């Protein structure tokens, strides 16, 4: 080749060399020193600049489950230039989140997290120190006190039972009204409103604006939240996307801003008639803790209350709403299952009273149905991302400090090593051999609320709420769809995954009151 030809190719050669050097620098920058005796987690080769973003696709839980079958329970991918370790397998996840919980209790400093309550959310904030732990305990105690604790002024066994019973009966009335008017309905918005009223009553008591249009519009737009707080959201790993037109991100910002303003206003109104000698809701309990904050070193200054209430509201809302919606759709597609639940309710409850929380141990088939909803749908496919708080190791692999960790709950719930026919909806799998109780060992293998030090603070109240809502609804109603209507159970990926809306659900009274 003539020298002149080399000269003509110089710009292309320089560009290729520059690209190669940049790629090499990026890849080298993501590598860490691995201590002797340990290995780096395995994983596939990624593309320059974008890493494995395209590999994740529209359903990252499925893509990463497939990769785990090839690379094992601890694998590593890159999203952009950020290394992400993906954990699968129940035993591996328990080892990380429970036995090595202090190592894996962090949160990554993701951009989308900074938009939630102005970056001060207890659930999404990277802080995992002693102040965070103490505030988390206080939030858990407040939630417990005004949900499963006894209400001395009510005939109900606890606050939660009182609020759910009231809202479940309202929901039945709304369904029957829609049946009389149209003959079918779309259940999501009705369920959203009822569940929001329950958690709102527990948070604010009589101060919660039950029929506020502002509140209803906010909770009905919660999809703008769950679509953005997802494992693998591109905006968290590619900063340039924050400055480009992004309608979904704009809706997410607006939702968070508006919801915080709504909570600030409601909390402030609540404070006007706060009486420390008569605590009747979660916010009141938090006010009491905040009163002596400066005097005795308490852990909740008043300005933090909105942030904590926001976390509690979220913990008691999205999971319950999604579980009930999935339940209704699977009831209409599995009529034999619905019939068995009806038979159990008729035998145990009869027709002279409503189900109560105390009936739960005597309704094992309904409980098995709910567990199978959690497992089969796995509608929380990943936990909120974790991060490591220090250099650590897992299964012989080195994981550096501040490494982003994805926990694949969907894989755990569909692991063929743990479950027979995992892709079949079969509530009976959770019953003991004599069908009289729940197989506790098997039920503890279901993952939906996370594990360890970041386990969802609303797990117990949420499970009780789902049970009582469904028990009351199914005691009174039979759910169907008209002949020929097909229900699409294909979920849309997000923090919580919901199936497509079905506008042709029907609810028929089972007996006259």
Swiss-Prot record:
Species in which this protein is naturally found: Rattus norvegicus (Rat)
This protein's GO CC annotations: endoplasmic reticulum membrane; intracellular membrane-bounded organelle
Catalytic activity: an organic molecule + reduced [NADPH--hemoprotein reductase] + O2 = an alcohol + oxidized [NADPH--hemoprotein reductase] + H2O + H(+); 17beta-estradiol + reduced [NADPH--hemoprotein reductase] + O2 = 2-hydroxy-17beta-estradiol + oxidized [NADPH--hemoprotein reductase] + H2O + H(+); 17beta-estradiol + reduced [NADPH--hemoprotein reductase] + O2 = 4-hydroxy-17beta-estradiol + oxidized [NADPH--hemoprotein reductase] + H2O + H(+); estrone + reduced [NADPH--hemoprotein reductase] + O2 = 2-hydroxyestrone + oxidized [NADPH--hemoprotein reductase] + H2O + H(+)
Protein name as annotated: Cytochrome P450 1A2
GO biological process: alkaloid metabolic process; arachidonate metabolic process; cellular respiration; cellular response to cadmium ion; cellular response to copper ion; cholesterol metabolic process; dibenzo-p-dioxin metabolic process; estrogen metabolic process
Record-listed heme binding positions: 456
GO molecular function: caffeine oxidase activity; demethylase activity; enzyme binding; estrogen 16-alpha-hydroxylase activity; estrogen 2-hydroxylase activity; heme binding; hydroperoxy icosatetraenoate dehydratase activity; iron ion binding
Keywords in alphabetical order: Endoplasmic reticulum, Fatty acid metabolism, Glycoprotein, Heme, Iron, Lipid metabolism, Lyase, Membrane, Metal-binding, Microsome, Monooxygenase, Oxidoreductase, Steroid metabolism, Sterol metabolism
Family, as annotated: Belongs to the cytochrome P450 family.
Known partners and oligomeric status: Interacts with PGRMC1; the interaction requires PGRMC1 homodimerization.
Primary localization class, coarse: endoplasmic reticulum
Glycosylation sites: 68
UniProt cross-references to SUPFAM superfamilies, sorted A to Z: Cytochrome P450
Cofactor(s) the protein needs: heme
PROSITE patterns: CYTOCHROME_P450 (PS00086)
Enzyme Commission code: 1.14.14.1, 4.2.1.152
Induction trigger: By 3-methylcholanthrene (3MC).
Gene3D superfamilies attached to this UniProt entry: Cytochrome P450 (1.10.630.10)
Free-text function comment from the UniProt entry: A cytochrome P450 monooxygenase involved in the metabolism of various endogenous substrates, including fatty acids, steroid hormones and vitamins. Mechanistically, uses molecular oxygen inserting one oxygen atom into a substrate, and reducing the second into a water molecule, with two electrons provided by NADPH via cytochrome P450 reductase (NADPH--hemoprotein reductase). Catalyzes the hydroxylation of carbon-hydrogen bonds. Exhibits high catalytic activity for the formation of hydroxyestrogens from estrone (E1) and 17beta-estradiol (E2), namely 2-hydroxy E1 and E2.
Membrane topology summary: Peripheral membrane protein
UniProt pathway: Cofactor metabolism; retinol metabolism; Steroid metabolism; cholesterol metabolism; Lipid metabolism; arachidonate metabolism
Localisation: Endoplasmic reticulum membrane; Microsome membrane
């Amino acid at each position: 080749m003539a020298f002149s030809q080399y000269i003509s190719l110089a710009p292309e050669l320089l560009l290729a060399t520059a690209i190669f050097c940049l790629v090499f620098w990026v890849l080298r920058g993501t590598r860490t020193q691995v201590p002797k005796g340990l290995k780096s987690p395995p994983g596939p080769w990624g593309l320059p600049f974008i890493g494995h973003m395209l590999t994740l696709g529209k359903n990252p839980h499925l893509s990463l489950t497939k990769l785990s079958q090839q690379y094992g329970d601890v694998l590593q991918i890159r999203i952009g230039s950020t290394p992400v370790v993906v954990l699968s397998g129940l035993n591996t996840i328990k080892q990380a989140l429970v036995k090595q919980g202090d190592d894996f209790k962090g949160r990554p400093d993701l951009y989308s997290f900074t938009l939630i309550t102005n970056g001060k959310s207890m659930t999404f904030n990277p802080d995992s120190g002693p102040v965070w732990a103490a505030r988390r305990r206080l939030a858990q105690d407040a939630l417990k006190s005004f949900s499963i604790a006894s209400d001395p002024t009510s005939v109900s066994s606890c606050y939660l039972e009182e609020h759910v019973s009231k809202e479940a009966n309202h929901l039945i009335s709304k369904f029957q009204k829609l049946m009389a008017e149209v003959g079918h309905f779309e259940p999501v918005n009705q369920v959203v409103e009822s569940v929001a009223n329950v958690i709102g009553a527990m948070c604010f008591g009589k101060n919660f604006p039950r029929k506020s249009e502002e509140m209803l519009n906010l909770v009905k737009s919660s999809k703008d939240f769950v679509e953005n707080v997802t494992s693998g959201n591109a905006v968290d790993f590619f900063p340039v996307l924050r400055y480009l037109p992004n309608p979904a991100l704009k809706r997410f910002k607006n939702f968070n801003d508006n919801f915080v303003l709504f909570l600030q206003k409601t909390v402030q109104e609540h404070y006007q008639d706060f009486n420390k000698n008569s605590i009747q809701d979660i916010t009141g309990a938090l006010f009491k803790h905040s009163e002596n904050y400066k005097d005795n070193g308490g852990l909740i200054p008043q300005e933090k209350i909105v942030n904590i209430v926001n976390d509690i509201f979220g913990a008691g809302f999205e999971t319950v709403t999604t579980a009930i919606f999935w339940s209704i759709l699977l009831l209409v597609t599995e009529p034999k299952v619905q019939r068995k639940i009806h038979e159990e309710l008729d035998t145990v409850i009869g027709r002279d009273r409503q189900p109560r929380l105390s009936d739960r141990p005597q309704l094992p088939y309904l409980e098995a149905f709910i567990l199978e909803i959690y497992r089969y749908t796995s509608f929380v496919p990943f936990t909120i991302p974790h991060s490591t708080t220090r250099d650590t190791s897992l299964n012989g692999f080195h994981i550096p400090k501040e490494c982003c960790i994805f926990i694949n709950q969907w894989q755990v719930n569909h692991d063929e090593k743990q479950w027979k026919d995992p892709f079949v909806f079969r509530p009976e799998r959770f019953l003991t051999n004599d069908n009289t109780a729940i197989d506790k060992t098997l039920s503890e293998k279901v993952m939906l609320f996370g594990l360890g030090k970041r386990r969802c603070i609303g797990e117990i109240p949420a499970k009780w709420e789902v049970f009582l809502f469904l028990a009351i609804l199914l005691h009174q109603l039979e759910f169907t769809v008209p002949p020929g209507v097909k229900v699409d159970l294909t979920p849309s990926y997000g923090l919580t995954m919901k199936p497509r809306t079905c506008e042709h659900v029907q609810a028929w009274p089972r007996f006259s009151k």
